[in-house]
């Protein structure tokens, strides 16, 4: 009988713990709300991606314009690095010399875009917002140049096309922010 009481007591205790912990683990995801985000995103070419990107980190809610600029550069740079890996994989798989050459062009464009975003971050930190704009534009152009290298067959793979558009959209967020920063042209 003591075993039965002990078992049921343990069962009730475990049930209470599970009931207590379960609602805590099912918290809805935190969405960053920042009035600056609602000012920035409608000015971009892809407002929904802008909202998704800038609201993806709860810390965005407390960031000022410069902080959101830093965050958007980081997101764009991460996207460019991921696309570089995709391009390297496509290059390794390519047997058509023309296609391989196009991938190599894209690889160079993305290496330049990553470098440009690194420079943009430094200019943001130093307060040189005009140079920030120039380097963010250069990163934007890198994705576009990759895209342009696929005029005519063989066509650009969908995965790379989408990655090019995404980098352009993310760089556009940086450009909008750079134009909103005080002292920019």
Swiss-Prot record:
Known role: Inhibits pectin methylesterase; may be involved in the regulation of fruit ripening.
Main location: cytoplasm
Record key words, sorted: Cytoplasm, Disulfide bond, Signal
Transmembrane segments: none
Signal peptide: 1-32
Pfam families listed in its UniProt record: PMEI
Any Gene Ontology CC annotation: cytoplasm
Tissue spec. comment: Fruit.
Originating gene: PMEI
Organism: Actinidia deliciosa (Kiwi)
Cystine connections: 41-50, 106-146
PANTHER family documented for this protein: PECTINESTERASE INHIBITOR-LIKE, PLANT INVERTASE_PECTIN METHYLESTERASE INHIBITOR SUPERFAMILY PROTEIN
Top-rank lineage group of the source organism: Eukaryota
InterPro entries xrefs: Invertase/methylesterase_inhib, PCW_Enzyme_Inhibitor, Pectinesterase_inhib_dom, PMEI_plant
Family to which this protein belongs: Belongs to the PMEI family.
Annotated GO MF terms: pectinesterase inhibitor activity
Database matches in CDD domains: PMEI
Protein name, per record: Pectinesterase inhibitor
Localisation per UniProt entry: Cytoplasm
Positions of the propeptide removed during maturation: 185
């Amino acid at each position: 009988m003591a075993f039965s009481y002990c078992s049921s007591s343990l069962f009730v205790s475990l049930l209470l713990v599970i009931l207590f912990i379960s609602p805590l683990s099912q918290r809805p995801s935190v969405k960053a709300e920042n009035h600056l985000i609602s000012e920035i995103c409608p000015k971009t070419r892809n407002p929904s991606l802008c909202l998704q990107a800038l609201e993806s980190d709860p810390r965005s809610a407390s960031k000022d314009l410069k902080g959101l600029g830093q965050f958007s550069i980081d997101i764009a740079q991460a996207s460019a690095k991921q696309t570089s890996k995709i391009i390297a994989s496509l290059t390794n798989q390519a047997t058509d010399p023309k296609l391989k050459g196009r991938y190599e062009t894209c690889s160079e464009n993305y290496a330049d875009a990553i470098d440009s975003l690194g420079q943009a971050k430094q200019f943001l930190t130093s307060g040189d917002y005009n140079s920030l704009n120039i380097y963010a534009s250069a990163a934007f152009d890198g994705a576009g140049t990759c895209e342009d290298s696929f005029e005519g067959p063989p066509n650009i793979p969908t995965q790379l096309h989408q990655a090019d558009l995404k980098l352009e959209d993310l760089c556009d967020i940086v450009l909008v922010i750079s134009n909103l920063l005080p002292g920019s042209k």
